[in-house]
């Protein structure tokens, strides 16, 4: 027999689940580190001093504690559901501390930052009023207000025109200062370009009305950064709202179905290898996939 949960109690349950998720992440990280340290202590003469140093490393970061309190006491919950969040969370558990780039500030920002303890989590937000509100309430978040060159109503023309602009081609693609490629994100803070990102979450900018920036440039630029990766391993790209035509079309054009490794609800997860891992790259080919 199904039991309906009263609507006024749903936010309490969701908040507790999220607080548990953050707390679980903290416990998981501490357990793994403690296990590693125990093995090490058994084989070293300086066990005591290293144990003291390790204990400090196990302590929860302020942002983790803030997240637990926030989601346990608030009726404001993230945009993504638990199944969608869990996909990114499972990768963060493996890679943290990592370099994590998130397009958009929102009700989930505190959660994402807390799930990447001692890593770099950077948020990019195009709505100035919303940026000011979120950063005022959570001044410890690392965030930049940014501007985009595109509009959602240009999506189809951008998808056609990039195929005739060599600066957009995968063999020659770059972002900083690439004014000729309209899909390249330019004019952003140096931190965006200078950091090699391990994970990218594309859940912004707005893409539900004609004059909105749309996510075309964010998706294209995520693909470029992943292909230009210098460090070992793949770049994980998470794209939300794939139920919408533009998100789905641009994902299949630039992130590639062959690199999609997981999905839940409205979220797709791609694991994209560096372009150097490909045997041959045709400098005159516009295709990413």
Curated annotation (Swiss-Prot):
Q: Which GO terms describe its biological process?
A: plant-type cell wall modification; protein methylation; xylan biosynthetic process
Q: Any idea of its EC number?
A: 2.1.1.-
For this entry, the protein name equals Arabinogalactan O-methyltransferase 1
* The keyword Transmembrane helix is annotated on this UniProt entry: yes
- Tell me the subunit arrangement: Binds to the translation initiation factors TIF3E1.
Q: Which NCBIfam families has this protein been placed in?
A: A_thal_3515 (TIGR01627)
Which GO-annotated molecular functions does the record name?
glucuronoxylan 4-O-methyltransferase activity
Q: Which organism is it from?
A: Arabidopsis thaliana
Main role?
Answer: Involved in the methylation of glucuronic acid of different plant cell wall component, but mainly on side chains of arabinogalactans.
Q: Which GO terms describe its cellular component?
A: endosome; Golgi apparatus; Golgi medial cisterna; Golgi membrane; nucleus; trans-Golgi network
Q: What happens when the gene is disrupted?
A: Strong reduction of methylation of glucuronic acid in several oligosaccharide chains of plant cell wall components. The double mutant agm1 and agm2 results in the absence of methylation on arabinogalactan glucoronic acid side chains.
* Assigned keywords, A-Z: Golgi apparatus, Membrane, Methyltransferase, Transferase, Transmembrane, Transmembrane helix
The protein's matches in InterPro entries, at most eight in alphabetical order, are given as:
IRX15/GXM/AGM (IPR006514), SAM-dependent_MTases_sf (IPR029063)
Q: Does the keyword DNA-binding apply?
A: no
> Which parts of the chain span the membrane according to its record?
12-32
Pfam families cross-referenced by the UniProt entry: IRX15_IRX15L_GXM
What family does this belong to? Answer: Belongs to the methyltransferase superfamily.
What is the membrane topology listed in the Swiss-Prot or TrEMBL record?
Single-pass membrane protein
Compartments reported by the entry:
Golgi apparatus membrane
């Amino acid at each position: 027999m199904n039991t309906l949960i009263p609507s006024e109690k749903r936010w309490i349950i969701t908040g507790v689940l999220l607080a548990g998720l953050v707390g679980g992440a903290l416990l998981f990280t501490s357990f793994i580190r403690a296990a590693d340290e125990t093995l090490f202590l058994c084989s070293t003469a300086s066990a005591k001093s290293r144990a003291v140093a390790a204990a400090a490393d196990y302590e929860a970061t302020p942002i983790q504690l803030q997240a637990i309190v926030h989601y346990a006491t608030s009726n404001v919950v993230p945009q993504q559901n638990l199944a969608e969040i869990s996909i990114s969370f499972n990768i963060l558990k493996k890679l943290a501390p990592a370099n994590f780039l998130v397009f958009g500030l929102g009700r989930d920002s505190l959660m994402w930052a807390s799930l990447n303890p001692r890593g770099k989590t950077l948020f990019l937000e195009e709505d100035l009023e919303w940026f000011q509100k979120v950063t005022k309430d959570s001044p410890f978040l690392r965030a930049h207000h940014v501007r985009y060159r595109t509009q959602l109503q240009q999506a189809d023309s951008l998808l056609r025109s990039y195929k005739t602009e060599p600066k957009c081609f995968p063999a020659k693609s770059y972002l900083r200062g690439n004014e000729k490629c309209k899909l390249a994100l330019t004019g952003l803070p140096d931190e965006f370009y200078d950091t090699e990102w391990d994970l990218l979450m594309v859940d912004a900018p707005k893409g539900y009305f004609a004059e909105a920036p749309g996510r075309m440039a964010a998706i294209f630029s995520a693909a470029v950064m992943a292909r230009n990766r210098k460090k070992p391993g793949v770049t994980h790209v998470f794209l939300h709202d794939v139920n919408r035509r533009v998100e789905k079309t641009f994902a299949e054009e630039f992130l590639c179905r062959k690199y999609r490794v997981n999905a839940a609800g409205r979220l797709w997860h791609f694991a994209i290898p560096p372009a150097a891992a490909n045997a041959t790259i045709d400098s005159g080919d516009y295709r990413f996939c």
